[in-house]
Amino acid sequence: MSRAGRQLALLLCSCCVAVAIPGGLAEEGCPAEPHQASRYVAAVYEHQSFLSPDPLALTSREQALELMHRNLDVYEQQVTTAARKGAQIIVFPEDGIHGFNFTRTSIYPFLDFMPSPRSVRWNPCLEPHRFNDTEVLQRLSCMAMKGEMFLVANLGTKQPCHSSDPGCPSDGRYQFNTNVVFSSNGTLVDRYRKHNLYFEAAFDTPLEVDHTVFDTPFAGKFGVFTCFDILFFDPAVRLLQDSEVKHVVYPTAWMNQLPLLAAIQIQRGFAIAFVINLLAANIHHPSLGMTGSGIHTPLKSFWHHSMDSPEGHLIIAEVARNPPGLISAGNATGKTDPFHRKFLQLLAGDPYSEKDAQDVHCDAAPKSTTNASPTFNSEMMYDNFTLVPVWGRDGHVHVCAHGLCCHLLYQRPTVSQELYALGVFDGLHTVHGTYYVQVCALVKCGGLGFDTCGQEITEAMGMFEFHLWGNFSTSYIFPMLLTSGMMLETPDQLGWESDQYFLKKRGLSSGLVTAALYGRLYERD
């Protein structure tokens, strides 16, 4: 069984947000995890990149290099800062050097030639004239060597091909969205060519999936993938079937989409589900909805999300070489907790528990002509969700669609003048990508009308203590907890209980925006 599907767990730590300090550096805003000998220092940089004023226009290699060197100058400054803080690895975002929205032709001057690191051992900084059109690789190599750290960056690359190659494009070359990895001495260690392209006409999909893993002296094996890849089995999940891969470097250019797929939501959920450290570097263009980076462990996150700041942001954190595992759900069921005991009784089909749970206090809730909450449909994430309103101070509600039934057992210290709803979706998502999902989600609606449920919101006042669960038919389930002001929260407990996957949370730090269990059925894509 995958690590995502193992029995889960009581999470003992809270999330932490990276905070800015003078000089542009960001450090964790709460105490570090207990010190262990086997730890390393990681850095990710969210980059406000310099972009081509007209990415569709044809330009020269010299003009392209002028733009890219401006971005590389910023990278070099961040490597210097990270080195002073003891960073052993740094990750930069997707598209951070060259930008985006090119055509296949207009991006050509921005591409470096890319030899295969598996067949050619090369240090671009020390051997700059070995291959033509490698100026970007040379600078990145020199940064890694000067900073004495592993460096991961994303750039466009080209690879000539012959007409005898049945996959060779008509212009005689492959163009790839490529991550490169340099060791601390500047050697090109490996590359990853993006497999799941997201409307990227400038690039080709590799004929075979790269399953890129590189080894480090300070933390063992790291996997590599890019942006949209995180939603698919290949290469992301297949990489993690290697039990020795406990860390992932993840350049991304992610456009946030609430309520379920903000960058930090999926990053955090992925780290928890697979019990790994995820080093995620996003591009920073708030006007395009692009922000959200972090160093995520199974128990804690150091992250940055800002729609206001025009500046890039460096995050540095010390994390464990062996990410702390999750405590067995069987050892942490909290049977002495009356609220959790009621949840277990509901799973067991205790009719008295069901009666008690549905005894909803409706003093501040809309009146209904029936005892059951009305179901309704609303668009969320371009999908047709079936939902029920969550009214009153406490209760148990459930909603089903196509065999997936989602349940919510909840208590509220006070009832805010906001509408919340429990939603379910079990089907093929077909907008901006095609993939099969099973989702149970408690969301704050954009207004008081049912048709506002699923809208993008970031602020909320509603406080909850709850169990959220469903009869998922996949073991790949990503837990998501987001509160007011784009703050990440950690579940108190989550796991399998009586063939139901559940998430438990008490003591939110601020109003709930989204609590979700986001399941992927890769085989049904």
Curated annotation (Swiss-Prot):
It catalyses: biocytin + H2O = biotin + L-lysine; biotin amide + H2O = biotin + NH4(+). Residues 1-26 form the signal peptide. Its EC number is 3.5.1.12. Glycans are attached at N132, N185, N384. SUPFAM superfamilies: Carbon-nitrogen hydrolase (SSF56317). It is found in: Secreted, Extracellular space. GO terms for cellular component: extracellular region. GO terms for molecular function: biotinidase activity. One of its GO terms (biological process) is biotin metabolic process. Keywords: Glycoprotein, Hydrolase, Secreted, Signal. It holds the Pfam family CN_hydrolase. Residues 54-333 form the CN hydrolase domain. It is an enzyme of class 3 (hydrolase). The active site is at E94 (proton acceptor), K194 (proton donor), C227 (nucleophile). PANTHER family: BIOTINIDASE (PTHR10609:SF14), BIOTINIDASE-RELATED (PTHR10609). Catalytic release of biotin from biocytin, the product of biotin-dependent carboxylases degradation. Belongs to the carbon-nitrogen hydrolase superfamily. BTD/VNN family. This is Biotinidase. It comes from Bos taurus.
